[in-house]
Amino acid sequence: MNPIVKSFEYGQHTVTLETGVIARQADAAVLASMGDTTVLVTVVGKKEADAGRDFFPLTVNYQEKTYAAGKIPGGFFKREGRPSEDETLIARLIDRPIRPLFPNGFKNEVQVIITVVSVDPQIEPDIISMIGTSAALAISGIPFSGPLGAARVGYIDGEYVLNPSVAQLATSQLNLVVAGTAGAVLMVESEAQALPEEVMLGSVVYGHDQQQVVIKAIAEFKAEAGKPTWDWTAPTQDADLVAQIKELAEAGLGDAYKIQVKQDRYAQVSVVKAATKEALLASNPSIDLREVDNLLGSLEKKVVRGRIIRGEPRIDGREPDMIRALSVLAGVLPRTHGSALFTRGETQALVTCTLGTERDAQKIDSIMGERTNRFMLHYNFPPYSVGETGMVGSPKRREIGHGKLAWRGINAVMPSAAEFPYSVRVVSEITESNGSSSMASVCGTSLALMDAGVPIKTSVAGIAMGLVKEGDDFVVLSDILGDEDHLGDMDFKVAGTRDGITALQMDIKIEGITKEIMDIALQQAYGARVHILNVMDQAIGSHRDDISDHAPRITVIKINPEKIRDVIGKGGAVIRALTEETGTTIELEDDGTVKIASSNGEATKEAIRRIEEITSEVEVGRIYNGKVIRIVDFGAFVNILPGKDGLVHISQISDERVANVSDHLELNQEVAVKVMEVDRQGRVRLSIKEAQTKETAAAE
């Protein structure tokens, strides 16, 4: 075994790429490390494509092993199970920039598996996973237009920071990941604290500039360790068939794409395609219909793009910077804590907000450590939203990714736990879809949060931008339709407030997207965002003054931290009795903060009263109503507060001489007692006769 190793400095860390020792039966295997965070990336591709396949079957599997962090998995089986949300998101992060770098017409199955085998808790494994994937594909021999670079960019104290540590990210106003080739940005994923457009654009340019060192190093690594490139050539098109299809279908497709209603348009496109196939089959019964479908798809793309470049109206008749008609409704569901229905053209989201206590927060235990999410956002895309049938069940990768993008868009305006001590779950049900459903979810979430009384800092809106570029000519499109997303060159989603951007996601399919084009897209998106915010604010301009009557109300009180154990009780008996008997939820924190949650105000008051009783100090000279709990020869023990007992000596029972305690007191008898003394050991001395004397004097 002769390892080939390439090391280089990248930001604050040393990156090492190694091949030739591990997983040698794969087409390529790279052990990539950044500091102590190490991933094993393997690539395997089939030498032949399966017959009849009309798509590129690329699979990216990202898996985090708990041994990488020196942990043993929880659960009964004590081994890793289905991918977590974080693993799914990182798999998508790797997939998105590499997919457009495979050549058109390449249909061979390719599988990339990234395994995290060692992790430094200060170095996220996503960037080194992207770098390792780029290196493995570069040396595999599989047709791939790499290398690809990747960088994380932070923004701290007005300065960009390359690949910030986890600790630095905690103070950063920006968490942006950018990936690209030597000449082009291909993918951006980010979360920001309402930063200006120029700062966001600058971070993309900065990250792309910095990752050139990665691209150069991988090119050198490939020169030393790369396998011969596969002998693969793209399938050639039948020029005569292309001409026939153009003659038969171009005019019909052009007319079909003037129909503004999506379902009607699709129906007419199907009619045109069916007529074209029928005509071709009549002249050549053995024609390959799969090839015809592919060529019709290419013609369809050319027709739509040509209209846009020529300055003609878009598919639905709009100008490039126009937003579809908006409908905004808040408070549409009677029993939810907050709700909204946001409609933009043929895209619609029904969004609900549910408030809960801290114990409802999501607890996440990953290889990067434990964390708690008080704000959750779940996105559902049922098949009926696009007029189709399909499976309904656990969320797919796309749904998880779209939900996280919407979460990033909103998270910057969420209140702190001190400002709003609730856990918040938002669910976005996409009820109609024709482009930009994730950004509709951002708008709907902002509205539903306000309807629920969540004190978010300001409204947030999202917009999806598109691009059509032919040579030096280009058109930036606002509020793209699903067809424009599919047929265009860029999907550019921006969420933010009036003051700045909170989330930016870009997926670019071509090279040649300049800084100028991205700047135009950002400025056009700003205008669209403000327009949407104006409409949203007419429906609900600020959060409700109070939360829903159906939501649990959390009351916060403070107790002496030393009294926490008294509230909990032995084996949790006291707090269990409190919650069961009052019907409330009670949470205790180490600093003495007590949170009582209930939708019943009287139950909350009763819980507070009982907690105050338990935690109150015995006051010397005060009269308490107590209960006799034990009788002894020399007196009786009386409970005056939960967990607080005192002794009434036989001489303090009555002014008269008492020979037998049982003649004057009995178990469970309620008596008034006065606290005479609390000694150094906390023992309480009580008196019944002094209490009676004080009560008699007060009556007189």
From Swiss-Prot:
Q: Which reaction does it catalyse?
A: RNA(n+1) + phosphate = RNA(n) + a ribonucleoside 5'-diphosphate
- Please list the GO biological process terms of this entry: mRNA catabolic process; RNA processing
At the top level, the lineage of the source is Bacteria
Q: Where does Mg(2+) bind?
A: 485, 491
Tell me where in this chain the KH domain is found: 552-611
Enzyme class (EC, first level): transferase
Q: What does this protein do?
A: Involved in mRNA degradation. Catalyzes the phosphorolysis of single-stranded polyribonucleotides processively in the 3'- to 5'-direction.
Q: Which NCBIfam families match?
A: polynuc_phos, PRK11824.1
> Which HAMAP family did the record assign?
PNPase
Record protein name field: Polyribonucleotide nucleotidyltransferase
| Species whose genome carries this gene | Shewanella baltica (strain OS155 / ATCC BAA-1091)
Q: What is the lineage of its organism?
A: Bacteria, Pseudomonadati, Pseudomonadota, Gammaproteobacteria, Alteromonadales
